[in-house]
């Protein structure tokens, strides 16, 4: 629920001030009343999200002097002047100078309320635009959503339209397409940006652990639960909860998550007491949850509860015009991080960028740019076919080509097993069997991670 709009009310007439305050409070405003302009001015700042209503004739600083101070503080802060009959020419001049409105005494209560509501709506739009502008500037520095294709422009516009609402969002896209980037932008561009952004990969935790991680637990809730634990949902209260790979959430946990979305409350393990939570949920899936066949055992009612707004991130192969721009950005960033000169992009490299399928999407492109910056991608990662004159048989050539594809995938994902499996689309056992058959050591590819990159060897 949004907070009631704020009003600073200034009038030295105690009875009139009290009557106006009661009228505004009955209309849903939160009113701070002051007998002097000096006292009110001390509580104002450029970040004040409300409006100012002031009488003109007051001892000390009068309403017009206060208006000039407010104009210097924030020219977009709406001020309504309350005037006597003889002050109307002064009030009209103030309107021309930037005051929002004037109300001549005596006035009906509805006149005051209507003017205040219009002024508050104007202020709300001003503050929202400022918030989005600040967040967009901050995000563009360290969290890019780069692309000039129409589909990316539409995605950016949609993000800006929904970011500052509290609507839950479902983000759909392939592995590495940037779902967490979108979720983080939704948080940073929203009024929740000062709260926590809490992420959880539902596919990375076993069923026995995920409920404790999400909902928390009390001491003695299960074997090993020695002390109280705050869950991810409660930790995200006041901010944003990002649930990645939500399609992997166990069915029993889905039931509890549906309750959280509907009631905005949790029940930690080991207690029957509920706790309210104020969260926005952004869920991500790499399968089409709207397709019953792809959805599997994911609950239909949970899908519809999350599917208030769905953002679809296109794979990189469907927006190839963005690849040179993205690659240049990643290459410059990696070169700066590694303390290297930005290497020139050769014609062969441009051809590779344009023709490669990029199964790992933006993440694969970013990793590739880092390897180019380090000078370890001289062959561009392209699997080399066996020469026709080598005398190798067809099965031998296929074996060699398969080994090259495995090495390329491991290189693209820095040895991360989960990402490599997703890119290749093969089961884990098949993957390890092929590594053993071809004599490939996964650890060799983990070691290619650059400085500052987390060691992927733990991601098994």
From Swiss-Prot:
One of its GO terms (cellular component) is cytoplasm. GO terms for biological process: phosphorelay signal transduction system; regulation of DNA-templated transcription. Residues 6-120 form the Response regulatory domain. Disulfide bonds: none annotated. Residues 145-374 form the Sigma-54 factor interaction domain. It holds the Pfam family Sigma54_activat. Residues 417-436 bind DNA. The modification 4-aspartylphosphate is found at residue 55. InterPro entries: AAA+_ATPase, CheY-like_superfamily, Homeodomain-like_sf, HTH_Fis, P-loop_NTPase, Sig_transdc_resp-reg_receiver, Sigma_54_int, Sigma_54_int_dom_ATP-bd_1. Phosphorylated by DctB. Residues 332-345 are annotated as: Inter-domain linker. Keywords: Activator, ATP-binding, Cytoplasm, DNA-binding, Nucleotide-binding, Phosphoprotein, Plasmid, Transcription, Transcription regulation, Two-component regulatory system. Transmembrane segments: none annotated. GO terms for molecular function: ATP binding; ATP hydrolysis activity; sequence-specific DNA binding. It is found in: Cytoplasm. ATP binds at residues 173-180, 236-245. Member of the two-component regulatory system DctB/DctD involved in the transport of C4-dicarboxylates. When activated by DctB acts in conjunction with sigma-54 to activate the transcription of dctA. This is C4-dicarboxylate transport transcriptional regulatory protein DctD. It comes from Rhizobium meliloti (strain 1021) (Ensifer meliloti). The lineage of its organism: Bacteria, Pseudomonadati, Pseudomonadota, Alphaproteobacteria, Hyphomicrobiales.
